[in-house]
Amino acid sequence: MNRDTSPDLHYLSGFGNEFASEALPGALPVGQNSPQKAPYGLYAELLSGTAFTMARSELRRTWLYRIRPSALHPRFERLARQPLSGPLGGINPNRLRWSPQPIPAEPTDFIEGWLPMVANAAAEKPAGVSIYIYRANRSMERVFFNADGELLLVPEQGRLRIATELGVMEVEPLEIAVIPRGMKFRVELLDGQARGYIAENHGAPLRIPDLGPIGSNGLANPRDFLTPVAHYEEAEAPVQLVQKFLGEHWACELQHSPLDVVAWHGSNVPYKYDLRRFNTIGTVSFDHPDPSIFTVLTSPTSVHGLANMDFVIFPPRWMVAENTFRPPWFHRNLMNEFMGLINGAYDAKAEGFLPGGASLHGVMSAHGPDAETCEKAIAADLAPHKIDNTMAFMFETSQVLRPSLQALECPQLQADYDSCWATLPSTFNPNRR
């Protein structure tokens, strides 16, 4: 069991484990899942994150032992205030970049502040990704669950205290959190306001990638993923329960807290990970390896090696390659790249890409270091140096990402993004090799 920065929070260590946790001694049944009478008069309930008949190594399910079953709720009604959504923007092959989105002035909780940026599938599809930027300036008083997909949260500003059915975790910038599809949770702001990124994964649950020839260690090590221990609320007071279903918000009112799980066991769990613990792999000879070596989590498809989504980071690291153009190379990619920046600067862009901002390079969209970065890299003294105080990341998808109407029409869209490559000179000389 691990203790995080908050003295009242404890975590279980590991990834893909069969965890077990109880807030009261003996609350977990012994030797079976659904006894006739569960300890303490609790109800047994199964939360399935995958189909029953998946391979055992890929199953995600958790047994919950709770004060009241989730079935105890009235009819859901569609909320008058709906999330920003609507049809995706028209076909647009251009490279796009956005400045940071402002945090709203009006009171906005976590689920009210989602700005849809890009997506590649409707919520009911069994694969695909929708990407948002969240902004909030007040804590949630209601409870939320997302029927449309698994949520990967990447804070850029402000710490979050996330109370889930399975326990409580705190997440700060340079950490991430993953919340399974359908799990109820509430987000409280520890710093007054918050901003960050969300990848809503409609496909196979995220997992750590295979390491191949890297071996048995490296990248995101399983022991650094932390799942909260059991914690329950026994409050009997009105609370709104909101669900996101096919992109819409529907709600009902309960007379009790739905975060009332006293004990649980299983593998369908929320977790957090500190990106500063990523064991970065890179060249110690020449050339710039493929960015797949920076993959933290992946959602696979049925095609081996082709991801529904990869979550990739560009952390602090030493650059030592000899006789090498060290920034990320110029590229035209089969995959689609949505990038964000948590802090510092990205080594391929000298200006214009700011923390809280974003960029989109779609399939076969030519991209690479800007003119200033390129000029400096060609002339650089190739002594070892460290890229420090930075954390950029990428959501990379196999299906084409299409920007939302809101993303295309917002004032933060940089109209002059293409100009960062406009002054790249031709240095070709057929008489000099």
From Swiss-Prot:
Domain of life: Bacteria
InterPro entries linked to this entry: HgmA_C, HgmA_N, Homogentis_dOase, Homogentis_dOase_bac, RmlC-like_jellyroll, RmlC_Cupin_sf
Keyword RNA-binding belongs to the record: no
Pathway assigned in UniProt: Amino-acid degradation; L-phenylalanine degradation; acetoacetate and fumarate from L-phenylalanine: step 4/6
Any one GO molecular-function label of the UniProt entry: homogentisate 1,2-dioxygenase activity
GO cellular component: cytoplasm
Active site as annotated: H288
Record's catalysed reaction(s): homogentisate + O2 = 4-maleylacetoacetate + H(+)
Assigned EC number: 1.13.11.5
Protein family (similarity comment): Belongs to the homogentisate dioxygenase family.
Protein name in UniProt: Homogentisate 1,2-dioxygenase
Organism: Pseudomonas putida (strain GB-1)
Gene this protein is translated from: hmgA
